């Protein structure tokens, strides 16, 4: 089975402030770019929105998907088991505080379960062409807010 490759990025002008997200999805020779923006948000919310919207754009289930992100927040939550711990602990973090962005994490969980998703860290602003493209999509989305 072929793999769907997803690159994502989020950006914020001020944190909080106007924010945007961008994603590139690639399957074989096919490629799709998506982006969006919110008037008042945070960088971390935009990073998560990029992943959520990219996974929503995939039709069907059972796909092999690899998500590349420069967000340590997203990558660590998945790879280090933070997300599982948060769920198990009633959405409290290690400091017994409410987990930030619960609404987005809760929206992400069924999307992760629908397919076989692996996540990988990409260094931001390091010349990776797809990460740079996602950053451009996110920044253009912010500009579209006016």
Curated annotation (Swiss-Prot):
Domain RNase H type-1: residue ranges: 1-143
Known EC number: 3.1.26.4
Catalytic activity reported: Endonucleolytic cleavage to 5'-phosphomonoester
UniProt GO molecular function: magnesium ion binding; nucleic acid binding; RNA-DNA hybrid ribonuclease activity
DNA-binding listed as a keyword: no
Subcellular location field: Cytoplasm
Any one GO BP annotation for this protein: DNA replication, removal of RNA primer
Record-listed Mg(2+) 1 binding positions: 9, 47, 70
Domain of life: Bacteria
Binding site for Mg(2+) 2: 9, 135
Keywords: Cytoplasm, Endonuclease, Hydrolase, Magnesium, Metal-binding, Nuclease
Keyword Transport applies: no
Matching Gene3D superfamilies: Ribonuclease H-like superfamily/Ribonuclease H (3.30.420.10)
GO cellular component term of the entry, any: cytoplasm
Entry-linked Pfam families: RNase_H
Cofactor(s), by name: Mg(2+)
Enzyme class: hydrolase
Binding note for cofactor: Binds 1 Mg(2+) ion per subunit. May bind a second metal ion at a regulatory site, or after substrate binding.
PROSITE patterns: RNASE_H_1
Function field: Endonuclease that specifically degrades the RNA of RNA-DNA hybrids.
Family from the record: Belongs to the RNase H family.
Subunit structure: Monomer.
Descriptive protein name: Ribonuclease H
Lineage: Bacteria, Bacillati, Bacillota, Clostridia, Eubacteriales
């Amino acid at each position: 089975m072929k793999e769907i490759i997803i690159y994502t990025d989020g950006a914020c002008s001020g944190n909080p402030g106007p924010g945007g997200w961008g994603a590139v999805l690639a399957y074989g020779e096919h490629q799709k770019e998506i982006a969006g923006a919110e008037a008042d948000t945070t960088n971390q919310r935009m990073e998560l929105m990029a992943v959520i919207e990219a996974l929503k754009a995939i039709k069907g289930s059972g796909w092999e998907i690899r998500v590349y992100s420069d967000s340590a927040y997203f990558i660590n939550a998945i790879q280090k088991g933070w997300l599982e711990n948060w769920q198990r602990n009633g959405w409290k973090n290690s400091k017994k505080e409410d987990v930030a962005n619960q609404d987005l994490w809760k929206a992400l969980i069924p999307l992760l379960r629908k397919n076989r998703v692996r996540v990988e860290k990409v260094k931001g602003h390091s010349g990776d062409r797809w990460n740079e493209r996602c950053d451009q999509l996110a920044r253009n989305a912010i500009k579209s807010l006016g």
